[in-house]
Structure formats: structure tokens, C-alpha cells
């Protein structure tokens, strides 16, 4: 049994909603257990959770937000996701119908690059003995499936969080340097104005002596 994170990227948004509706009624089997799932869409560069379900909870649809899936969604929608995916993302058309098992450092980058504006995806936390079961579920639609061991995905998340902190630190340092330069220029401007004012005063006094 392997615990996996599965990202199913859809070419057609309506199919993503249909698939998620069917997924919420998913009949659990030993060979493919689904714990949590969230449907996300990308609009104007923002990652928006549209629907979610948690088979491990009696209520609280948002229970996924504090776990691995929530972290993945947050990172994909954050500065690291933007850096990994570029400005527009890449169309998934040529990859439709494929299922890719990814190694370390690959899930976030691949998902970010394939999520372009207007696209949708379903992210699942599953335990699988037979990966073909969920592949078959999603390949009824025009999808690309990305799969990664959940532990490896968690390691990616932790690395991305550290990277985000470093990006924030560097941005803050750059901002402080910019403000320091602006304040220095402002002070210099005041000094020059003071020098000009003093010179003018003494020039007037000198003129009276002529």
C-alpha cells in the first residue's frame, strides 16, 4: 500500500466538476482508499478552492485545509507557485490521457506549470494498492494525472515553505535598502536646500556692503 498525492488536471472545467461530484459519492475499496479531495481552479493568477470533501471526517468540509492538501494548495497559489509556473502556465493538451509518477521536487513544479488561467484540477490524498483504479476513474475525462508519494510531497511542502520564508526575507531586505536609499536622498536634498538658503542670506548681506 502506498499513500499518494494525486493531482488530476482537467482540460475542460465542466468535466472537473462532474468528476468531483462523482468522487464525493466514491465507494471506498481496499485497493484504492480516498481520504481527502479538493477541487481547485485558477482565475487571474489565483488558486481558488471551489469544492472539497473529507472522507475521514463526519463534518467539517474544510478539514483538509490544515493538512498536506491544504499546504499544496497554499503553495501553488503563493509566490513559489508563481515562480515555478511562470506567468501563464502551460497547456496540458498534449499530455491528456497520461499518468505520471513523479519523484522528489517534481509535483509542485509540474502542477504549477500545467495550471494555466481558467484551468481546474482535483487534488486527492489516497492510499493505493492498485493505481489503475483511480487512473481509470479520471481517464474517463480529458485529464493529466500527476502522482507522488505523500511523504515525498510533504518534504516538498516543507522545502517550499522554507523557500517562501527566504523569498520574503530577501524582499524585506530589498525594501529596507530601498527605503534607506530614499531617506538618504531625502536628507541630501534637505542639506542642499539648507546650503542654498544660507548662501542666499550671506549673498544678500554682502550685497548691502557694496
Feature map (PLM): residue ranges:
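Extended, charge-rich low-complexity interaction segments
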Residues: 64-76, 173-210
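Short, low-complexity, glycine-enriched hydrophobic/amphipathic alpha-helices that associate
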Residues: 56-102
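Short cationic amphipathic helices and targeting signals
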Residues: 4-11, 120-126
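A generic local secondary-structure boundary/capping motif
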Residues: 26-28, 110-113, 134-135
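Membrane-engaging insertion elements
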Residues: 87-126
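Amphipathic, membrane-inserting segments
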Residues: 114-176
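Charged, alpha-helix-enriched surfaces in structured cytosolic catalytic cores
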Residues: 14-18, 59-63, 82, 106, ...
Amino acid at each position: 500500500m502506498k499513500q499518494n498525492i494525486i493531482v488530476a488536471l482537467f482540460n475542460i472545467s465542466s468535466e472537473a466538476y462532474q468528476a468531483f461530484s462523482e468522487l464525493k459519492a466514491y465507494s471506498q475499496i481496499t485497493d484504492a482508499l480516498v481520504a481527502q479531495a479538493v477541487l481547485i481552479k485558477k482565475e487571474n493568477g489565483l488558486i481558488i478552492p471551489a469544492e472539497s470533501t473529507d472522507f475521514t471526517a463526519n463534518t467539517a468540509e474544510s478539514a483538509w485545509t490544515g493538512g498536506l492538501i491544504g499546504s499544496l494548495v497554499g503553495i501553488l497559489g503563493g509566490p513559489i507557485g508563481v515562480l515555478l509556473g511562470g506567468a501563464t502556465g502551460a497547456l496540458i493538451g498534449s499530455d491528456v490521457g497520461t499518468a505520471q509518477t513523479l519523484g522528489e521536487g517534481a509535483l509542485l513544479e509540474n502542477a504549477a506549470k500545467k495550471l494555466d488561467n481558467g484551468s481546474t484540477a482535483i487534488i486527492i490524498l489516497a492510499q493505493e494498492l492498485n493505481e489503475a483504479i483511480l487512473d481509470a476513474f479520471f481517464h474517463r475525462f480529458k485529464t493529466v494525472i500527476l502522482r507522488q508519494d505523500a511523504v515525498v510531497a510533504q518534504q516538498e511542502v516543507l522545502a517550499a515553505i522554507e523557500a517562501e520564508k527566504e523569498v520574503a526575507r530577501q524582499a524585506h531586505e530589498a525594501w529596507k535598502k530601498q527605503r534607506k536609499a530614499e531617506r538618504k536622498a531625502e536628507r541630501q536634498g534637505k542639506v542642499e536646500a539648507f546650503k542654498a538658503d544660507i548662501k542666499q542670506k550671506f549673498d544678500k548681506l554682502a550685497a548691502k556692503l557694496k
